[in-house]
Amino acid sequence: MELKKDSNAVAIDMLLIVHSEKRRAAQATHLDPQANPGALLQNRGGFQGVRNGIRKWQELEENSFQGNLPEKQCLQQPQVITSYDNQGTQLTVEIHPQDAMPQLLKKFSLAKRLQGDKNGNMRPRQPGGKDAHAYPWDRSSLKSMPLDLRLFEKLDASASQVTVKSGLNELVSDLLQEAHSDLERVRAIWIWICHHIEYDVEAAQEKDRQAFKPTDILRTQKTNCDGYAGLFERMCRVAGVQCVTVPGYSKGFGYQTGQSFSGEFDHAWNAVYLEGRWHLVDSTWGSGLVDTTTSKFTFLYNEFYFLTHPALFIEDHFPDNKNWQLLKPPQSLRQFENSMYHKSEFYNKGMLSAHPETSMIRTVNGKATITIESRAPTLFMFMLNGKQEHGLLSLRKNGMKLEVYPPTMGTHKLQIFAKGNSEIYSSVLEYTLKCNYVDFSVQLPSELHQPVGPSWFSEQMGITKPSHSDPIIHTSDGRCAISFSVEEGVSVLASLHGDDGPITEETQRRYIFQLNRGKRTELKVQLPHAGKFALKIFVKKRQEQGNFIFVFNYLLCCANTKVNWPMFPESFGNWGQDNELLEPLSGVLPANRNVAFKLKLHGIAKALVKGQDTWPLTLNPEGYWEGSCNTAGCQEVYVMVLENANHNFYSYILKYKVNDQ
């Protein structure tokens, strides 16, 4: 007991109810005769072995009951009479310890919202049938209740700017200035915590440093998951909204695909009661993330964990009490461990499903196939054991298909990333691959990047109507021709890559000869030898600065060991986009031979071939420049043009080499 300066004021750590004699009689009829009316509420330190400090938080929460313990763990509660109509007046006096928060019963009508049990104990009700959502997810919404997030824009902006002036009571009061419903009250609290409370990575490793008291959390603005959940619950109670803290297992920081869970709980989150049903929130994961490499926290707001649909929430949250799954039917711990973990970005970026639906995949004949369905076109990439190798990823209008060929037997880690409108790829799925057979006939080039084959993305970048829609092209003689339409103002560049060559940037382009016929572009390809090659396609808008952008590639396959094609002639800057070379296509000419030339050149006055001597080319009626030259005594042969008839300066446009005699 502490006496204040005012002699009429007394601070007592208990709940005092003052009522009339009539009310005493009414009270006597409701009290359990076996109960000890003078017993104080005991500490709820019943979660043995909880690593993240839920037990400590509960010890600080005297005079509260969350209703999320199994029945056998519920402790004896004191009997409290809440109201008796027409039986006199009732005065309730609440006196709190220094670190506790007043409930503001009158201002926010908390007493009307909290539901009592048959004995009059005020506590949130346990979830029941009307709270349960069907499992599996019906794809209707990411939320457990209809929401239009645009209606929260003003409230979110206001709540995120509120600062702590004194204590939690005033903070909640400031937050609720723009809130006019329980949903808006919860939203304001959620936004404030997610934008102001930092996850304390260091304290997570040192239990003695963890902050559990609201005063400590507000002062340092740091805590751990149990602190987030406890603070969220206390703020909701001050705001007059039923809220409980739910402990359990999670697939969060440090989770390994396929791992099992036992022993201590490693996480805590909340359930809030809105519009007659319970809903789930996780303000820890809504506030940001911890970098796995640096172990540093970064604020990165995640809307996904606000009123998450329970059928999605169960993918990474398993509560201690199955009732708090809010699912029908509830899932077992074994199902939780074995189920596919779709990360929040999977759903944030509009994806619907993935196949296989288990986190562990066994290869079949050395191959594993993964497909993803999405609501809209999405960019994907993958990494196998940390490298973008040994797979073929093709984009579809509503998803993607990935074929993976592990290079060795054993266990492999497969990560899949997706990209929406932002410039950053986010991890959305992780699989563990078990490979007991390697198909050595499938040796993909290390430079084969993703995606393979034309798609909606190549159309978006200006390449349409491809001659080859399949990403894999087989050629028996080592040659192929690929064509597609190109939007006006778009330039195309191609290069050939193989593990055994070509090597230099020049040779990567010299096995491809590009022809432009109106709006169609044709790529003539000659392979230097048998094997598998990546034909990369790049584009660039001519009016924009910067480099060419990779769009997609083809996989070229040739099993003919006799293939040994030379490079195409080297072209120079004056070789126009619309020029066309018919012959000779080989970049190496035979020695001591007459060689015919035929080209279509635009905007020139004269053309000639220069070797040991000079041979002019003439323009025929079809618009082709024709002629021939003799390679005797030549090591190199050039095609040259005169663009202006009033000048005498010729420009090099093509260069050939001549075989040694």
From Swiss-Prot:
Coiled coil: none annotated. Disulfide bonds: none annotated. Keywords: Cytoplasm, Cytoskeleton, Hydrolase, Protease. Its main location: cytoplasm. Disruption phenotype: Mice exhibit a primary degenerative myopathy preceding chronic thoraco-lumbar kyphoscoliosis. Residues 116-137 are annotated as: Disordered. Its EC number is 3.4.-.-. Specifically expressed in skeletal and cardiac muscle. It is found in: Cytoplasm, Cytoskeleton; Cytoplasm, Myofibril, Sarcomere, Z line. GO terms for biological process: muscle organ development; neuromuscular junction development; proteolysis. The keyword Signal does not apply. Used as a marker for 'occult' heart disease, as its absence does not cause heart pathology in heart. PANTHER family: CYTOKINESIS PROTEIN 3 (PTHR46333), KYPHOSCOLIOSIS PEPTIDASE (PTHR46333:SF3). Probable cytoskeleton-associated protease required for normal muscle growth. Involved in function, maturation and stabilization of the neuromuscular junction. May act by cleaving muscle-specific proteins such as FLNC. This is Kyphoscoliosis peptidase. It comes from Mus musculus (Mouse). The gene is Ky.
